[in-house]
């Protein structure tokens, strides 16, 4: 049995569906998945997609993971608590299970550090087919005079998204191109709902507005895979950063922020503040376009801001209260 972990339920479902489609087999037979409250696998399943939490739970009853001969840990760069615990567990398990094959995959992983951690494990680089992606910087801070005083008020993120969509439409007219789909990264559900309301009120012609976040029902999530004659604007959290590839995206609008779980020592509670993302996350977002044709990534912050950001996001284990773990 091949076990393949994903950090989110939405990704486990969509990857299982794609692998089953590639192999020409019904989902739930040779290829299945298991997430919380849902198990679409059986005794004949040979490839099992699951969240990393499900595999961790299985270690309670099967300490040596004897059901599996191969474990694939995907999106390892996210360094969530579950992923770090899983990687630590597998490292201690390998001397006891030398026959177990462990594959760690990621697009923006720190290769040397991970390889060294697993006793200089071999590194295999798989280059996907990508097209060139141009980067535009459109910071929210508007004009300043020579003394540094603002001539105009700063834009809100919603206003900047609308202005950027207008700029994209003008660019397409000048280049005589058909409307392309746009993926907009926002920090959370509330920001997505606010932006969706604003865009619907703007009554953009031949444009479909689609929200995308982890708590959406599977039926709602499937809407992003359906074609649309005009332009689709997908408003997504960082669930679309790595876990899900939205097809046909030509433009990415990156707000540069995400909700990042962090423990407050002062308040003694776990919080979800909106913070600036790392360079690795920004590059992941940029990579969402340029899959099927040349793309453009529009960042709603300056190039200086990007260059000053940390290379990687802090591992969750460094920003979480471990007392309850």
Language-model segments: which ranges?
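P-loop NTPase motor module signature
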Residues: 1-325
């Amino acid at each position: 049995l091949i076990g393949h972990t994903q950090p989110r339920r939405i990704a486990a479902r969509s990857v299982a569906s794609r692998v089953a489609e590639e192999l020409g087999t019904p989902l739930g037979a040779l290829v299945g998945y298991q997430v919380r409250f849902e198990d679409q696998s059986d005794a004949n399943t040979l490839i099992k997609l699951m969240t990393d939490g499900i595999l961790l739970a299985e270690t309670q009853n099967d300490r040596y993971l004897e059901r599996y001969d191969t474990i694939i840990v995907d999106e390892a760069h996210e360094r969530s608590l579950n992923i770090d615990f899983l990687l630590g567990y597998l490292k201690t398990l390998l001397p006891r299970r030398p026959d177990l094959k462990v594959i760690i995959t990621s697009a923006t992983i720190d290769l040397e550090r991970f390889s060294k951690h697993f006793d200089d494990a071999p590194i295999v680089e798989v280059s996907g087919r990508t097209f060139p992606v141009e980067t535009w910087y459109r910071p929210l801070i508007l004009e300043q005079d020579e003394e540094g005083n603002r001539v105009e008020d700063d834009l809100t993120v919603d206003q900047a998204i609308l202005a950027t969509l207008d700029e994209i439409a003008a660019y397409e007219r000048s280049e005589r191109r058909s409307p392309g789909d746009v993926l907009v990264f926002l920090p959370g559900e509330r920001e997505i709902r606010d932006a969706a309301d604003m865009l619907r009120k703007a009554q953009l012609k031949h444009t479909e507005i689609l929200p995308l976040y982890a708590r959406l029902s599977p039926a709602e999530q499937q809407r992003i895979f359906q074609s649309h004659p005009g332009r689709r604007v997908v408003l997504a959290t960082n669930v679309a950063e790595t876990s899900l590839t939205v097809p046909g995206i030509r433009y990415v609008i990156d707000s540069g922020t995400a909700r990042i779980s962090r423990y407050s020592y002062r308040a003694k509670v776990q919080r979800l503040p909106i913070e600036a993302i790392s360079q690795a996350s920004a590059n992941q977002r940029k990579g969402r376009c340029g899959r099927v044709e040349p793309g453009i990534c529009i960042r709603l912050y300056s190039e200086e801001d990007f260059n000053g950001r940390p290379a990687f996001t802090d591992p969750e284990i460094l920003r979480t209260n471990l007392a309850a773990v």
